[in-house]
Structure formats: structure tokens, C-alpha cells
């Protein structure tokens, strides 16, 4: 399936991004990665903050492709767009982030203590790697957004 198919299905809509919007989103990512590294916060909060940073990176990619998610399943669609943009080799990364999405929802809405410090550290490390991948992709495909 392609992003055009997603648009035709009504899952995403057209969006024109800008360098300023991308800069603002990267600033959120950097802030969230810094905050998530604080061991003064619970593992649940650190995990949720790191998840937000990863989600913003997926958002940057989707925006750079000229789309934004519709309201229904917005996080899910944004995450699942990762392999459509960066390539099929990122399918496992999208699957991992979807598992993180579910866990983040659990610790945000249902119960405390479901995320461990190791979970938070793993997601922080993953997000740092994804940040490098997103910057490299933008430099190659949409340098005007950097």
C-alpha cells in the first residue's frame, strides 16, 4: 500500500509543511529526549516522553511527504507510515513503535508501573537512532526543510 492509497482511503489528507514547522517539531524531539533521560522521573513518564519524541519524528516524515493523519487512529497511522517512507526495512521499527504506543496508552490511562527503566532506556536509544535516520532522509529528499 502507498501513501496515495491511504489518502484515497481517507486515512490521511494533504498537508503543506514548512522549514519552520519542521524546526519546531525537531525542537520538541530534542526537548523530549532530554526530559526522558531524567532519572528523576518515573519510568512510565520517561517512556511516554520518549514515545512522544519518536511519534514526532514519524510526523516530520509524514509531513515532509505532504500528508497528515486524519483524526481517527492518528498515532497508529503516523507510525505505520514509517516503512512507506523510509522503506520496508523499517517495518520492524514501526511494529516496535506500535507496541510502544499500546504500552504508552496503558501507562497514561490505565495503570502505573507498566514501563520499566529498561523499557524507557531502550525507547530513548531507539528514538535517538531514528532521529539520525530522519535527518539523513530529509537531507537527501527534502533538504529545504532542514
Model feature map: region roles:
Residues 1-146:
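Terminal alpha-helical segments
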